[in-house]
Design a protein with these regions (language model features):
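Membrane-interfacial amphipathic/re-entrant helices at transmembrane-helix boundaries
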Residues: 1-15, 44, 55-62, 88-93, ...
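Inter-helical junctions in multi-pass inner-membrane proteins, predominant
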Residues: 1-12, 136, 157-162, 188-234, ...
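Membrane-embedded helix boundary and interhelical linker motif in transport proteins
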Residues: 4, 26-76, 80, 210-211, ...
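Helix-loop-helix "hairpin" substructures at the membrane interface of multi-pass membrane proteins
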Residues: 10, 135-212, 236-241, 305-309
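Alpha-helical transmembrane segments within multi-pass membrane transporters and channels
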Residues: 20, 54-100, 107, 241-246, ...
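Pore- or pathway-lining transmembrane helices of multi-pass membrane proteins that form conduits
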Residues: 36-40, 85-109, 217-229, 257-276, ...
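Transmembrane helix-bundle core of multi-pass membrane transporters
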Residues: 85, 90-160, 187, 252, ...
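Cytosolic-side transmembrane-helix boundaries in multi-pass membrane proteins
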Residues: 111, 115, 172-179, 183-186, ...
Length: 341
């Protein structure tokens, strides 16, 4: 049951991380405002759902329309702000996207107020299916199916269309794409639209499970960055696998201690960065985009004894959360987790 719950929670995380990975792969901008698109998707889906009524068609129409509206907002952000700073230092780009976060926060507070919004139930998916002694919400099953559909749609989009070919080419060499006569500005804008739509869709479909509040952007962006790094920059399939991994860690880790999920998430990222700096499905040549700078080589584990030692250490670290409740008292456990966080 916890496994299926983890898959359901990974659905929206995958959509957000996929959009973030696509945007970074082409524009090379670490979009700190991507979590704001996720938050806007939830709030817009709430308002549109109120207007369209409580039918199944109205609910899913609100979800799709909210995602498209977030995509248009992403286009405005790209055209008015980010297009002017593509050649700026990374620190300036990060500060600019953080400014967008503050603007969206204030706009959301002004439009919807400070109160948390309770998400509506998805019509037709408001019951649960019994699996053994437990019950799994039908909406969780819908999220699992939706994430697979989104993954397939993205694969077809990037592998079977000319636009997808151009995007993959721009991910490898933007200058060569420009030399071939491709309008880079509008290619970047279209990529930003797709990435923002994915983030908005992730927020909209998560609304029935968690509602909407002003902390959604900050709560999702850290996990999304971890998923992108673990999966590999620019890899959609890697983002999917990493989202599933993080979702399962959260689902099982919460059984031990709720806050330990954050520790497990960054522990996995640290291990991946040490052994495979470019991510699970990333490529070494994508690990850096600075001319003349070589991608970092992974840690070389010489000999089978060293490899076995690292494996034992990794397994011990992963098993530590399950062993600590029996090894130390609750107060010491809470204190240790707070220190790690």
């Amino acid at each position: 049951m916890q496994f299926l719950t983890g898959l359901a929670s990974a659905a929206s995380l995958f959509m957000v991380a996929a959009g973030l990975s696509i945007i970074f792969g082409v524009s090379r901008i670490v979009n700190f405002a991507h979590g704001s698109f996720y938050m806007l998707g939830a709030y817009l889906a709430y308002s549109l759902g109120q207007r369209f009524g409580g039918s199944g068609l109205g609910f899913w129409s609100a979800v799709v329309l909210a995602a498209l509206l977030v995509g248009l907002i992403g286009v405005l952000v790209e055209v008015l702000i980010l297009r002017r700073i593509y050649q700026a230092p990374e620190l300036f780009q990060l500060l600019a996207t953080f400014g967008v976060v503050l603007i969206v926060q204030d706009a959301t507070l002004w439009l919807w107020g400070p109160e948390d919004l309770i998400g509506p139930r998805a019509p037709g998916l408001d019951s649960a299916i019994r699996i053994g002694q437990d019950y799994l919400p039908e909406y969780d099953i819908a999220l699992i199916v939706l994430s697979a559909v989104v993954l397939l749609a993205l694969w077809l989009l990037f592998r079977k269309t000319r636009w997808g070919t151009l995007v993959r080419a721009a991910t490898q060499d933007r200058e060569m794409v420009a030399a071939l006569g491709v309008n880079q500005a509008w290619l970047f804008t279209s990529v930003f639209f797709v990435g923002a739509v994915l983030a908005g869709l992730g927020g909209a479909v998560q609304l029935p499970k968690g509602g909407a509040d002003l902390l959604l952007d900050m709560n999702i962006i850290a996990a999304a960055f971890v998923v992108v790094v673990v999966g590999g920059m620019g890899s959609i399939t890697g983002a999917f696998l990493a989202a599933v991994l993080i979702g399962e860690l959260n689902a099982f880790g919460v059984l031990i201690f709720p806050q330990i999920t954050l520790v497990l998430m960054f522990l996995v990222m640290a291990v991946v960065l040490v052994i495979r700096p470019w991510g699970l499905l990333g490529r070494p040549e994508d690990a850096t985009h600075t001319p003349g700078v070589q991608a970092q080589e992974p840690l070389r584990l010489a000999g089978w004894k060293a490899q076995a030692g690292w494996l034992v250490l990794l397994l011990g670290l992963l098993a530590l959360p399950w062993l600590t409740p029996w090894l130390i008292d609750e107060f010491t456990l809470v204190l240790a987790i707070e220190i790690l966080i």
